[in-house]
Amino acid sequence: MSWIERIKSNITPTRKASIPEGVWTKCDSCGQVLYRAELERNLEVCPKCDHHMRMTARNRLHSLLDEGSLVELGSELEPKDVLKFRDSKKYKDRLASAQKETGEKDALVVMKGTLYGMPVVAAAFEFAFMGGSMGSVVGARFVRAVEQALEDNCPLICFSASGGARMQEALMSLMQMAKTSAALAKMQERGLPYISVLTDPTMGGVSASFAMLGDLNIAEPKALIGFAGPRVIEQTVREKLPPGFQRSEFLIEKGAIDMIVRRPEMRLKLASILAKLMNLPAPNPEAPREGVVVPPVPDQEPEA
């Protein structure tokens, strides 16, 4: 027996360890491989390059509001395919697919609760639901959020992440721009603060309506914010756009937004601002949250 055969006879094969899917993920910016649980504890912010990844609507609201205080609003509202719209796929099929993928009925989630003990109403977009596009249900839920803020005499916060108006609802989608803007006028008349938080991306009809109507417009770092996208603009003007065009840092230099706030600092910053605007005691800084625990969304059958 040769020495190679002797070595081979002493080698015991081992089974390949099976790693469940979703345990690891990769940063979209720097390519760093990240432990999923650690990334969630860091509010979907890359610990290496500080890239702010997209966050689900429910995770965002649960990371903002005080635990045990959240009450969802407008969950009974569901989208309808009244136009029987069809492009490469039926609209009702797109809705069913998005509902199955995200567990949400539509692209906006609204909740009321407390922020450091202060009553607030908060709304957040679910970008994974048809690109966070604004349809009639998104508009109706936003108006519901405004009405609740007026009823409770409290501030409203909205986290935008949208590609714009939903083309499958045509004019009914476009009219939400006026509808939501008119609702916010009531907040202004009452003297109640509305803070708009612009996340990546905030585009189209959403950026052209309530997303830019905040008493304070705050953006996350490097968020893409605008009406038409950079590629569309370049093709139209036939010129190369400057580096960082339509990003948060570019917009704050031009005076289009008020401030840029990192996601881990957002909760305390919003509470501090609202306390001043509402003439309330400043919040006491607390230790960083250990993570976000989100209750499962109840099973739902998409409408045929």
Swiss-Prot record:
<feature type="domain" description="CoA carboxyltransferase N-terminal">
    <location>
        <begin position="23"/>
        <end position="292"/>
    </location>
</feature>
<keyword id="KW-0276">Fatty acid metabolism</keyword>
<keyword id="KW-0694">RNA-binding</keyword>
<keyword id="KW-0444">Lipid biosynthesis</keyword>
<keyword id="KW-0067">ATP-binding</keyword>
<dbReference type="GO" id="GO:0005829">
    <property type="term" value="C:cytosol"/>
</dbReference>
<dbReference type="InterPro" id="IPR011762">
    <property type="entry name" value="COA_CT_N"/>
</dbReference>
<keyword id="KW-0443">Lipid metabolism</keyword>
<comment type="pathway">
    <text>Lipid metabolism; malonyl-CoA biosynthesis; malonyl-CoA from acetyl-CoA: step 1/1.</text>
</comment>
<keyword id="KW-0963">Cytoplasm</keyword>
<dbReference type="Pfam" id="PF01039">
    <property type="entry name" value="Carboxyl_trans"/>
</dbReference>
<dbReference type="InterPro" id="IPR041010">
    <property type="entry name" value="Znf-ACC"/>
</dbReference>
<dbReference type="GO" id="GO:2001295">
    <property type="term" value="P:malonyl-CoA biosynthetic process"/>
</dbReference>
<dbReference type="GO" id="GO:0017148">
    <property type="term" value="P:negative regulation of translation"/>
</dbReference>
<dbReference type="GO" id="GO:0008270">
    <property type="term" value="F:zinc ion binding"/>
</dbReference>
<dbReference type="GO" id="GO:0003677">
    <property type="term" value="F:DNA binding"/>
</dbReference>
<keyword id="KW-0275">Fatty acid biosynthesis</keyword>
<dbReference type="GO" id="GO:0009329">
    <property type="term" value="C:acetate CoA-transferase complex"/>
</dbReference>
<dbReference type="GO" id="GO:0006633">
    <property type="term" value="P:fatty acid biosynthetic process"/>
</dbReference>
<feature type="binding site">
    <location>
        <position position="27"/>
    </location>
    <ligand>
        <name>Zn(2+)</name>
    </ligand>
</feature>
<comment type="function">
    <text>Controls translation of mRNA for both itself and the alpha-subunit (accA) by binding to a probable hairpin in the 5' of the mRNA. Binding to mRNA inhibits translation; this is partially relieved by acetyl-CoA. Increasing amounts of mRNA also inhibit enzyme activity.</text>
</comment>
<dbReference type="GO" id="GO:0009317">
    <property type="term" value="C:acetyl-CoA carboxylase complex"/>
</dbReference>
<keyword id="KW-0810">Translation regulation</keyword>
<dbReference type="GO" id="GO:0042759">
    <property type="term" value="P:long-chain fatty acid biosynthetic process"/>
</dbReference>
<keyword id="KW-0862">Zinc</keyword>
<comment type="function">
    <text>Component of the acetyl coenzyme A carboxylase (ACC) complex. Biotin carboxylase (BC) catalyzes the carboxylation of biotin on its carrier protein (BCCP) and then the CO(2) group is transferred by the transcarboxylase to acetyl-CoA to form malonyl-CoA.</text>
</comment>
<dbReference type="GO" id="GO:0003989">
    <property type="term" value="F:acetyl-CoA carboxylase activity"/>
</dbReference>
<keyword id="KW-0863">Zinc-finger</keyword>
<keyword id="KW-0479">Metal-binding</keyword>
<feature type="zinc finger region" description="C4-type">
    <location>
        <begin position="27"/>
        <end position="49"/>
    </location>
</feature>
<feature type="compositionally biased region" description="Pro residues">
    <location>
        <begin position="295"/>
        <end position="304"/>
    </location>
</feature>
<dbReference type="InterPro" id="IPR034733">
    <property type="entry name" value="AcCoA_carboxyl_beta"/>
</dbReference>
<keyword id="KW-0808">Transferase</keyword>
<dbReference type="GO" id="GO:0016743">
    <property type="term" value="F:carboxyl- or carbamoyltransferase activity"/>
</dbReference>
<dbReference type="GO" id="GO:0005524">
    <property type="term" value="F:ATP binding"/>
</dbReference>
<comment type="similarity">
    <text>Belongs to the AccD/PCCB family.</text>
</comment>
<keyword id="KW-0547">Nucleotide-binding</keyword>
<dbReference type="Pfam" id="PF17848">
    <property type="entry name" value="Zn_ribbon_ACC"/>
</dbReference>
<feature type="binding site">
    <location>
        <position position="30"/>
    </location>
    <ligand>
        <name>Zn(2+)</name>
    </ligand>
</feature>
<feature type="binding site">
    <location>
        <position position="49"/>
    </location>
    <ligand>
        <name>Zn(2+)</name>
    </ligand>
</feature>
<feature type="binding site">
    <location>
        <position position="46"/>
    </location>
    <ligand>
        <name>Zn(2+)</name>
    </ligand>
</feature>
<protein>
    <recommendedName>
        <fullName>Acetyl-coenzyme A carboxylase carboxyl transferase subunit beta</fullName>
        <ecNumber>2.1.3.15</ecNumber>
    </recommendedName>
</protein>
